Each structure stands twice: as structure tokens, then as C-alpha cells.
């Protein structure tokens, strides 16, 4: 694909009245001469589409293929150099916990409420906007959200500008660093939050109304662990802010969207009066796991999903390492051997097991490899490797790897070379 310098400038307008959203996208990129562009696209209706090239508007024909989840855009003549692909479309604010979806909950007064949130990993950004929805096709993003005045809008970056737009408010966010589509985040809801700072990095834990008093532990852990990861990796956290969001309806335990990590409410909220130490430990481990991803996965991303273990094994291993440093009394490495190793070995003994590096051809196969082999067996292998090469050499190797491949993609063999 002769495409480079990709930027998505997208405005989203979620409509809770009929659970749909409107999208306006300007996709800018540099291309070698071509008259056909194929994007990933699913469950989206295209209203308008054209190309801007050298200050001229070029008409196009477009075709959606639901089975291939693709949008083919064809112009009569070839275009090259810097061009803009302009698309106006509508989508579904679904209730399937993927793509751009609605999360239903009850507020303290017993009233039913909705928020809009996203889950794009592994291949569901295409349900929110037409894009090249693959981890290796990194881009920058300029996001804006048009929302009702009683709502607050969130994305990966801080708000650059906020202004009235008719009866609504438009939130414009700063441009993201170069990153994969699956790490983009959009959130619209009636949030409240607690906040702190690490140097000039704003850290917040956001909850639905009536729950922020249960967010203090998570805030404290996030600040502690983030600083420790910076020290260990030798690379500062690169974004100006970090939000941790408690989502009522959430399929995964948590998701490491860069600068806007989402969690199940039960995993992020802690009530010291009623919650156990076991709950506190679980919250600490999940927060640590997601923070590890801000480097392993977000800063350096696997080229394709066969190397998912590069994300998940490291996050599993590092999560235990960092939490153990602050809470040695929990004996986390003993628990790791008992839980992670036994789970992984039991699964690995079955005929249906697979290598850590597993072949993936189609997005539908990706979800199947988010299992104990990718997470726990990989984590155990890394623990064994660290023990073999020594802590210091292991750390040096990781620092070298992260520095070499920051803001780009890597494969398993790139790590071994480091």
C-alpha cells in the first residue's frame, strides 16, 4: 500500500434519541498514483464521499461490502501526492459492547441513563469510521465530539477548544501522537471525577454520578504505578493526560486506549468499608496491566495480531512486577506461579492449544487468541527469561527495544534481537 502520513480529522455526533451517530471525516494522506482506495468499514451508511486533490474536488464511485467489511472508493482519474478523502456518514450506537456503543445504567435517583463509549480492539474502529483498521497502519487523529450540553465528552487527548454550537457543545481535542486505530477512544456521558497530577500530567478517574467517592484508591494506584513504569522503562509517559473511566456495560475487564483507559465499574471502584483486600489486589493488578500497555502496545505496537503476546504477555508480567514492588506482603509471584502458570499449563496440555505466536488470517479469529496462552504462558516465559539473563540485562533489553521502535510497530524477533 503506497500510503503514508495518515491523519484522520473526524467529528462525531451521538444521538441518544434513536441510538445512532453522525460522522464527518476528512482522511488526509500521501499516496502513490492510484484511482482506488479500499478502507475497512462496517455497519456504516455513506451519505457523501469525494476526494480533494490539489484544490480540486474529484467525484468518486463507492461500494460497501458488508461481508468483507470494506468500502471501495474509485475515481475516474488517478490521484497522487497529498490528498483528502471526505466522507459523511451515519452509524449505529449499538448495544453489543463493541465499536461505538451505548452503555445503559441507573443513576442514584433510579433513573435510566445512557453514555456513549467505544471498544475498538481488535478490529471494531471500522464500526465508528471508515479507516485502515490494522495495527501497523498508524495515524494521527484530530477528534471532535458534538454533544448535548448536559454531557461531557472524552477522547485520548486533552480538550483543545470547547464552544457552543446551536443547542449543543462541540469539544475539539488536541491531535494524538501517531498510533493504531484500535487505541482511539470516544466517550460521552454525565461523568464526575477525582484528579491528581504526576509532574504536569493530569490524572483523573471518571465515574457515573454518585460513584466518585469510590475512585480514590484507583487514583492513588495510577499515580504510583505510572511513575514507577517511567523509571523502569526509562521513557516518560508521552501524553499530557491520563483518564481512567469506569464504564457500567463493558465486555472486557479493561482496555488500554492511549490516555483514556476504560474499565468495568467493578474493577475500578473500591469501597474501603465493604471491599476486601482481594478486591484491592485485583484492582491494583488490572490498573498495572493497563498502564504497562501505555508502553507495550501503545508506544510500540505489534505489526499484526499473531504477535498479540508482545502486548499481553508483557503487560501480564510487568503488572505483577510493579504491584509486587509496592505490596510485597501480597506474595504476588507465588500467586503468579499458582494461578498463571497452572492455568497456562493446563490449557497448553490440550490438543487445542496454540503457540504464543499464533497465525491469524481474519479479524474474526483475533478474539479467540485473547486467552491464557497469550497472557499467562507468555508471562511465565518472560519471567523465566528474566531469571536467565538477570534483571538488569532484561531491563536494558526492554529499554533498548522500546526506544528503537517507539511510535512504530515491531515483531517478536525484534524483541529477541534487543
Region spans (language model):
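Hydrophobic alpha-helical and helix-loop surface patches within well-folded domains
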Residues: 173, 199-418
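Acidic/His-enriched low-complexity segments
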Residues: 1-244, 266, 271, 370-373, ...
